[in-house]
From Swiss-Prot:
Similarity comment text for this entry: Belongs to the thymidylate synthase family. Bacterial-type ThyA subfamily.
Function: Catalyzes the reductive methylation of 2'-deoxyuridine-5'-monophosphate (dUMP) to 2'-deoxythymidine-5'-monophosphate (dTMP) while utilizing 5,10-methylenetetrahydrofolate (mTHF) as the methyl donor and reductant in the reaction, yielding dihydrofolate (DHF) as a by-product. This enzymatic reaction provides an intracellular de novo source of dTMP, an essential precursor for DNA biosynthesis.
UniProt subunit comment: Homodimer.
Binding site residues for dUMP: 21, 126-127, 166-169, 177, 207-209
Record flagged with keyword Methyltransferase: yes
Protein name, entry field: Thymidylate synthase
Active site: 146 (nucleophile)
Sequence positions that bind (6R)-5,10-methylene-5,6,7,8-tetrahydrofolate: 51, 169, 263
Keywords assigned by UniProt, alphabetized: Cytoplasm, Methyltransferase, Nucleotide biosynthesis, Transferase
Catalytic activity: dUMP + (6R)-5,10-methylene-5,6,7,8-tetrahydrofolate = 7,8-dihydrofolate + dTMP
Recorded superkingdom: Bacteria
Organism: Serratia proteamaculans (strain 568)
Length: 264
């Protein structure tokens, strides 16, 4: 995960001080890309311990089309708590857009099922895309989508994915995002009888919050370790039938966790 540390160094060296929605302040660059060959290991940051339970449960929550934090709280995942209302609702965030995008004529489009069918029936299509950026519903969302748009690509029997992330919290959020989409690629590949290819991450406003600088400097003193391996223990009937227990990470030997405040 040297690419991740290189990005941190780039933001520190080249970033522009900017105000932001949270009032915290950032150092920011615009436009950055990283490529991870998923054949070479699972891209889970090793220079600090990442909370894999949260990553897996959040993705399963998205895949279920859920937009209430009850499932997350039942599984001791608190990453969305700050944005939920008193009933645990978040509005039409990722799960709603991925599984039930509303159309002007009242239909709902299950983008993930559509994409799965495309991968199986027309893998050379250039339209294998999922978008969470629903302009008509942004004002109803507790938080506008940060990881907004992703595209799949099949070549030589391998499935690759590119994500466009319009806003990226490099210290706290990005390790989660990389691991989450890498996990999704593995799941989609298994369902489509493909090997995994690359995960390509593309960032828009890519920033370090001003109250993450000490933590960033600490992380940059640490040497990356070997990437772990993802094992999926069974092949469920569909993409939407995976359970937390289906996933195992082998050989994850991270440096200790580094705590930092979330900008809300």
């Amino acid at each position: 995960m040297k690419q991740y540390l290189d990005l941190m160094n780039k933001v520190l060296a080249e970033g522009t001080p900017k105000a932001d929605r949270t009032g915290t302040g950032t150092l920011s660059i615009f436009g950055h890309q990283m490529r991870f060959n998923l054949q070479e290991g699972f891209p889970l940051v090793t220079t600090k311990k990442c909370h894999l339970r949260s990553i897996i449960h959040e993705l399963l929550w998205f895949l279920n089309g859920d937009t209430n934090v009850a499932y997350l709280k039942e599984n001791k995942v608190s990453i969305w708590d700050e944005w939920a209302d008193e009933n645990g609702n978040l509005g039409p965030v990722y799960g709603k857009q991925w599984r039930a995008w509303g159309t002007a004529d009242g239909r709902q489009i299950d983008q993930l099922t559509t994409v799965l069918n495309q991968l199986k029936q027309d893998p050379d299509s250039r339209r294998i895309i999922v978008s969470a950026w629903n302009v008509g519903e942004l004002d109803q969302m507790a938080l506008a989508p940060c990881h907004a748009f992703f595209q799949f690509y099949v070549a030589d029997g391998k499935l690759s994915c590119q994500l466009y992330q319009r806003s990226c919290d490099v210290f706290l959020g990005l390790p989660f995002n990389i691991a989450s989409y890498a996990l999704l690629v593995h799941m989609m590949a298994q369902q489509c009888d493909l090997e995994v290819g690359d995960f390509v991450w593309t960032g828009g406003d890519t920033h370090l919050y001003s109250n993450h600088m000490e933590q960033t400097q600490l992380q940059l003193t640490r040497e990356p370790r070997a990437l772990p391996k993802l094992v999926i223990k069974r092949k469920p009937a569909s993409l939407f039938d995976y359970r937390f227990e289906d996933f195992e990470i082998e050989g994850y030997d991270p440096h200790p966790a580094i705590k930092a405040p979330v900008a809300i």
